[in-house]
């Protein structure tokens, strides 16, 4: 068996380097290099490095040292690697110094052109060199880096370091100044070759090599931009600030108007954004925008805010949108605009209501229409110009709450009714909308109007007052079958429930249910008691109302004529048989009926209240009565009888024997008789409308009287719920929770809450903790 001796190679370093230097000259002159020549250079580097290693390893083996299967780290190998690394560095340094010397004589745009051209050539040539010395990169340089040796770089990085130390550091001030001057020229309207700037920017980014740290240790993104930011971006932002500070000052000192200024700022911001995309590094986008915004917007906020109110008055929505977008770009830029908007909307709302105050006080439709016109105008503005920004939405809400709850219309009401007037008018508008009429809107329009009503309803502070008025009017629509549409009624209840919760509409839903049950009950009654009623009985429909769900109605006693009393008596028997233990209380004040009359020149069908029917039927017995006689015959009291007779006189069905001061204030001694000359174009005449107007006035008075007492009950119940859950609560926390829980229904006054707490302590629902007067305890 024969031993094969390792191939022994020797290389003269001077010969090898001469060959490599010639190849580098070709690369740095940007001459074509054939692939074969490139591979020859690469192989020369490889052979030179490995030949020294192999030779040294052979000698070590002959001296009896252990042989290794991998090339050993030897002093000879270190020397060769370091020698070649130094020669590469010296070659590049000589090349760069020559380039620098030529550029030192240039300035301005000529310098930028020269610099970018030479840099691009240098970068490409250095990439070629990096490939030629790839073996050096992978072995000696990599080993040096792994062992933590400083000031050692991969060949391409070495080229960048040499460029930075020997060219950039000498020319940087002139180059950066030339860049800034070129950018300034573009800002003033000149055409420039942006490639000169982008080329230098690319160079600065590539020069992001930290001399003090190895390539392996660097945070690539942060360190990569270090040169760019330190030497260019800082000065660029400073120049930008100075340029736009002067431009803004010149514009405003020459009397420029706010619209032109905003357009100019928009244009400049767009130009700077384009500039960044075209020839600056993307990392500059944010600081550049911040710089421009600071100078052009933040420093001019007073000027912009001062003109905001005028733009609102002139309804220049496009300019308002422009101002919003600009001010939104800077910290706290919108704060004053929000305040101005709130004040302006509140002022507009109050002025609009002042213009219609006299008519709107009694015209619910006009009142709500005026509120909506103001709100819709500014809701549209907030949507389109202010992009529904939450702060501007809040400004609209605050302003709307202000002028909807307290305005010129509400101030025309009596003092005790001012707080409830807005809620009352909104409820009356709902009643008009949902009540049968000759001009009822179609289904789609009704849905749209209901949605608009909910806009106003949202801002009503006293939603409990609205509920009282609405419930009263809703009950009358149901009782008198005056609803325009069952579906529309149900739809509106759903909207109220969606905004205020189930509890708010529970009574309304129960009322609807009662009417449905009553229809079935009436049909069952007519079927089962047909024989008792007989063929000559009156047409009869009944509503059985749950006492806890419906508003409280006056139960004025009255003596019914025999035609009615018999039917009512039979129904009472039927109901007691069906529901044993329940008690019926007849509410004649809310009952209606129809009377066919032939006492006049033509036949009429009158719709009348129970009291009106009883009064009119008396005239079947004789031609005239005193009011006192009518009261005695019907068992009406001295307050009700004159009012009922007065309503019939006002409708011209009856006439008094003497002239009355007021038709609704008929003295008990007055004599009245049928007005046999009564004429009306309509055959069907509703006599109950007059009493309905009287009821409306009375309802308003009753709601106003009951609001405070009802609120005390609600507040007390809320306090008990909180105490029952918490057991022990601090005074301020209890106050806060009560206000929070009830704010959806009304705004409870602090004094009223305190009185309710005191009352509950007296009733022993709760007590003040001994020694801690601001702490309450619940008593089971």
Curated annotation (Swiss-Prot):
Residues 710-771 form the Cullin neddylation domain. GO terms for cellular component: cytoplasm; SCF ubiquitin ligase complex. Pfam families: Cullin (PF00888), Cullin_Nedd8 (PF10557). Pathway: Protein modification; protein ubiquitination. There is a cross-link at residue 724 (Glycyl lysine isopeptide (Lys-Gly) (interchain with G-Cter in NEDD8)). Neddylated; which enhances the ubiquitination activity of SCF. GO terms for molecular function: protein-macromolecule adaptor activity; ubiquitin protein ligase binding. Ubiquitous. GO terms for biological process: cell division; determination of adult lifespan; embryo development ending in birth or egg hatching; negative regulation of apoptotic process; negative regulation of cell population proliferation; negative regulation of centrosome duplication; negative regulation of DNA damage response, signal transduction by p53 class mediator; negative regulation of mitotic cell cycle. Signal peptide: none annotated. Its main location: cytoplasm. InterPro entries: Cullin, Cullin_CS, Cullin_homology, Cullin_homology_sf, Cullin_N, Cullin_neddylation_domain, Cullin_repeat-like_dom_sf, WH-like_DNA-bd_sf. Keywords: Cell cycle, Cell division, Cytoplasm, Isopeptide bond, Ubl conjugation, Ubl conjugation pathway. It is found in: Cytoplasm. Belongs to the cullin family. Probable core component of multiple cullin-RING-based SCF (SKP1-CUL1-F-box) E3 ubiquitin-protein ligase complexes which mediate the ubiquitination and subsequent proteasomal degradation of target proteins. As a scaffold protein may contribute to catalysis through positioning of the substrate and the ubiquitin-conjugating enzyme. Required for developmentally programmed transitions from the G1 phase of the cell cycle to the G0 phase or the apoptotic pathway. Component of an SCF (SKP1-CUL1-F-box protein) E3 ubiquitin ligase complex composed of cul-1, fsn-1, rpm-1 and skr-1. Interacts with Skp1-related proteins skr-1, skr-2, skr-3, skr-4, skr-7, skr-8, skr-9 and skr-10. This is Cullin-1. It comes from Caenorhabditis elegans. The lineage of its organism: Eukaryota, Metazoa, Ecdysozoa, Nematoda, Chromadorea.
């Amino acid at each position: 068996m024969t031993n094969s001796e390792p191939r022994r190679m020797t290389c003269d370093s001077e010969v090898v380097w001469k060959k490599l230097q010639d190849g580098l000259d070709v690369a740095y002159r940007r001459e074509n290099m054939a692939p074969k020549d490139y591979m020859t250079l690469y192989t020369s580097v490889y052979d030179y490095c490995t030949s020294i290693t192999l030779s040294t390893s052979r000698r070590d083996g002959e001296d009896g040292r252990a042989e290794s299967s991998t090339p050993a780290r030897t002093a000879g190998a270190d020397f060769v690697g370091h020698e070649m690394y130094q020669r590469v560095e010296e070659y590049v340094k000589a090349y760069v110094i020559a380039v620098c010397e030529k550029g030192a004589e240039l300035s301005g745009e000529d310098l930028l052109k020269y610099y970018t051209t030479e840099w691009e050539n240098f970068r490409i040539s250095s990439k070629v060199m990096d490939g030629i010395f790839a073996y050096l990169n992978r072995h000696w340089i990599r080993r040096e880096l792994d062992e933590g040796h400083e000031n050692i770089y991969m060949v391409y990085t070495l080229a960048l370091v040499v460029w930075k130390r020997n060219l950039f550091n000498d020319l940087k001030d002139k180059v950066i100044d030339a860049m800034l001057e070129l950018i300034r020229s573009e800002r003033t309207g000149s055409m420039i070759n942006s490639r000169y700037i982008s080329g230098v920017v690319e160079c600065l980014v590539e020069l992001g090599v930290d001399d003090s740290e190895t390539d392996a240790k660097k945070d690539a993104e942060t360190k990569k931009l270090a040169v760019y930011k330190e030497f260019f971006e800082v000065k660029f932002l400073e120049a930008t600030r100075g340029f736009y500070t002067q431009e803004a000052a010149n514009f405003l000192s020459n009397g420029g108007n706010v619209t032109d200024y905003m357009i100019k700022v928009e244009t400049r911001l767009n130009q700077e954004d384009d500039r960044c995309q075209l020839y600056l590094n993307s990392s500059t986008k944010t600081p550049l925008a911040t710089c421009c915004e600071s100078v052009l917007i933040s420093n001019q906020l007073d000027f912009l805010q001062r003109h905001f109110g005028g733009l609102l008055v002139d309804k220049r929505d496009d300019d308002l949108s422009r101002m919003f977008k600009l001010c939104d770009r800077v910290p706290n830029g919108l704060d004053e605009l929000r305040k101005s908007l709130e004040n302006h909307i509140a002022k507009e709302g109050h002025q609009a209501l002042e213009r219609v105050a006299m008519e709107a006080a009694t015209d619910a439709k006009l009142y709500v229409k005026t509120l909506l016109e103001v709100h819709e105008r500014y809701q549209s503005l907030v949507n389109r110009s202010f992009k529904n920004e939450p702060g501007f939405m809040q400004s609209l809400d605050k302003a709307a709450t202000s002028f909807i709850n307290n305005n010129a219309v509400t101030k025309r009401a009596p003092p005790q009714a001012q707080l409830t007037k807005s809620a009352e008018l909104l409820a009356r508008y709902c009643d008009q909308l949902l009540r049968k009429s000759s001009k009822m809107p179609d289904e789609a329009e009704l849905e749209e109007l209901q949605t608009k009503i909910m806009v106003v309803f949202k801002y009503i502070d006293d939603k409990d007052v609205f509920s009282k008025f609405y419930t009263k009017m809703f009950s009358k629509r149901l009782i008198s079958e005056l609803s325009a549409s069952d579906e529309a009624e149900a739809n509106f209840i759903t909207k109220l429930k969606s905004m205020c919760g189930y509890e708010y509409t529970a009574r309304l839903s129960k009322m609807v249910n009662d009417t449905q049950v009553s229809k079935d009950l009436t049909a069952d009654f007519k079927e089962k008691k047909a024989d008792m009623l007989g063929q000559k009985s009156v047409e009869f429909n009944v509503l059985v109302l749950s006492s806890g769900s419906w508003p409280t109605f006056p139960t004025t006693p009255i003596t019914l004529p025999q035609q009615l009393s018999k039917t009512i008596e039979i129904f009472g028997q039927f109901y007691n048989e069906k529901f044993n233990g329940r008690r019926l209380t007849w509410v004649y004040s809310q009952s209606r009926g129809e009377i066919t009359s032939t006492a006049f020149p033509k036949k009429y069908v009158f719709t009348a209240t129970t009291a009106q029917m009883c009064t009119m039927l008396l005239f079947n017995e004789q031609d005239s009565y005193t009011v006192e006689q009518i009261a005695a015959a019907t068992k009406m009291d001295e307050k009700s009888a004159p009012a009922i007779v007065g309503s019939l006189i006002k409708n011209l069905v009856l006439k008094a024997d003497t002239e009355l001061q007021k038709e609704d204030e008929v003295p008990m001694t007055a004599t009245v008789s049928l007005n046999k000359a009564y004429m009306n174009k309509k055959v069907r005449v509703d006599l109950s409308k007059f009493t309905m107007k009287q009821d409306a006035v009375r309802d308003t008075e009753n709601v106003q009287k009951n609001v405070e007492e009802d609120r005390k009950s609600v507040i007390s119940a809320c306090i008990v719920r909180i105490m029952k859950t918490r057991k022990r609560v601090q005074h301020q926390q209890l106050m806060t929770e009560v206000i929070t829980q009830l704010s959806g229904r009304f705004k409870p006054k602090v004094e009223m809450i305190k009185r309710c707490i005191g009352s509950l302590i007296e009733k022993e629902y709760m007590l003040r903790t001994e020694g801690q007067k601001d702490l309450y305890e619940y008593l089971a």
